[in-house]
């Protein structure tokens, strides 16, 4: 094999090996969060379960916080971020609301135990898990403010509801905690939860002309 071809092959092999190692580490984090949701994330346990050295985790992710950031991004992608992104890009703000709630509900349902563990562990380990959750919440906070403003611009908010108040209400209704309570304590299926949350948005925020009759 020619030297240049050999180098390219070796580079590709190293990249594939690094990617496989990264996948094993992220899978080990997933297992840790589902098996020990009340315990702080242990890099020693993650490394052991992934079959790598602790130093490999630092080499791949930089830090514990970097590992959790990467895990959160992977979690969003695997549980349905693309569908959520598509839903909130709709030109009709009411479809933005409906589709966004359906997509977010399905995301939470796809990995309910992991999302619950992340939000719980953020309070136990704010320096690492907390950073990943804070970023998730910061993105959602901006999304709710944008959505509330879109509703106001479309003259859909009922009298007496400010943009800020609408954002607060949307924040509550689209939270994981609201989904988890309805799924776990009330036993509702994901599509039932999405339908109920969408009706609640209409009842709480929309003026009479904006509410579409139920079929």
Predicted segment positions?
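Basic, helix-initiating cap at the start of DNA-binding domains
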Residues: 1-51, 59-60, 65-66
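Alpha-helical DNA-contacting segments of helix-turn-helix folds
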Residues: 33, 68-75
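Short, basic, alpha-helical segments at the C-terminal edge of helix-turn-helix-like DNA-binding modules
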Residues: 43-45, 72-80
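Key DNA-contact positions within bacterial/archaeal DNA-binding proteins
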Residues: 55
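Residues in the recognition helix of alpha-helical DNA-binding motifs
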Residues: 60-61, 70, 147, 196
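Hydrophobic alpha-helical connector segments
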Residues: 70, 83-110, 167
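Amphipathic alpha-helical packing segments from all-alpha helical-bundle domains
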Residues: 106-119, 128-154, 164-168, 195, ...
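Hydrophobic/aromatic-rich alpha-helical bundle segments in the mid-to-C-terminal region
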Residues: 152-200, 208-215
């Amino acid at each position: 094999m020619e030297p240049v071809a050999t180098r390219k092959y070796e580079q590709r092999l190293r990249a594939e090996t690094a990617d496989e190692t990264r996948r094993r580490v992220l899978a080990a984090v997933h297992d840790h969060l589902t098996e020990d949701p009340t315990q702080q994330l242990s890099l020693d346990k993650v490394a052991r379960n992934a079959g790598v050295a602790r130093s490999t985790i630092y080499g791949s992710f930089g830090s514990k916080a970097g590992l959790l950031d990467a895990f959160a991004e992977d979690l969003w992608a695997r549980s349905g971020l693309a569908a959520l992104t598509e839903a909130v890009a709709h030109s009709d703000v009411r479809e933005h609301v409906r589709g966004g709630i359906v997509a977010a509900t399905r995301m939470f349902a796809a990995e309910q135990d992991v999302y619950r563990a992340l939000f719980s562990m953020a309070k136990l380990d704010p320096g690492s898990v907390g950073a990943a959750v804070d970023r998730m919440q910061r993105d959602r906070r901006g999304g709710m403010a944008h959505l509330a403003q879109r509703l106001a611009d479309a003259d859909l908010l009922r009298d007496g509801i400010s943009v800020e108040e609408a954002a607060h209400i949307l924040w509550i209704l689209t939270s994981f905690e609201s989904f988890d309570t309805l799924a776990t304590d009330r036993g509702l299926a994901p599509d039932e939860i999405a339908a109920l949350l969408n009706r609640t948005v209409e009842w709480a925020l929309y003026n009479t002309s904006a509410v579409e009759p139920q079929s």
